[in-house]
Amino acid sequence: METGQRRNRRLCHKRMRGTFWVAGVVIWFFWVGSALALDPAPVKPSKKDKCPVCGMFVYKYPDWVGEIIFKDGTTAFFDGAKDLFKYYFDLKKYNHGKTQKDIAAIYVTEYYDVKLMDAHKAFFVMGSDVYGPMGRELIPFYTKQDAGEFKKDHKGKRILVFKQITPAVIKKLDD
């Protein structure tokens, strides 16, 4: 009788381990899936996509593309970081019904690599002698070192990170 109880305990223990293992795998998949959903990948603008700020066709300026992806899957494309920030700071004007809380991701094109990067991780050079499609521009870089070298080589005035960029900074670019 004692042998039968031991066998039952072993079987029960094995079932419990299997249940915990399956539960762990399910939780892991949900965690990975939700982490991926938080950072949607950038997409390439089509020939029909226009900058909502200036009306220019964005595909003509691949070296300057910026984009804001909303949680509902819609995307706004820009022909430079300056117009992207104008839009970001005045969503009521350009996309009423949306707020900054509706934004899933913001991308800008890194100057040297010419690849889209997370705008929140970029270092922006302001006031350089390099102009974008809409004139004076914020020039994005992966590293502060790259931004510093560019600032020195191209007579830049300041290096800023995302949270330092304000409507007043953007207005100064157009003055």
Segments from the language model and where they lie:
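N-terminal secretory signal peptides that target proteins for export/translocation
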Residues: 1-18
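Residues immediately within or flanking Cys/His clusters that coordinate Zn2+
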Residues: 48
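Cys/His-coordinated zinc-binding microdomains
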Residues: 55
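Bacterial N-terminal signal peptides
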Residues: 21-32
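Short cysteine-rich clusters marking metal-coordination/redox-active sites
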Residues: 51
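Mid-length scaffold segments of soluble, non-membrane domains
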Residues: 73-116
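Sec/Tat signal peptide C-region and signal peptidase I cleavage site
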Residues: 33-37
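Thiol/selenol-based redox catalytic cores and closely related redox-interacting motifs
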Residues: 99-162
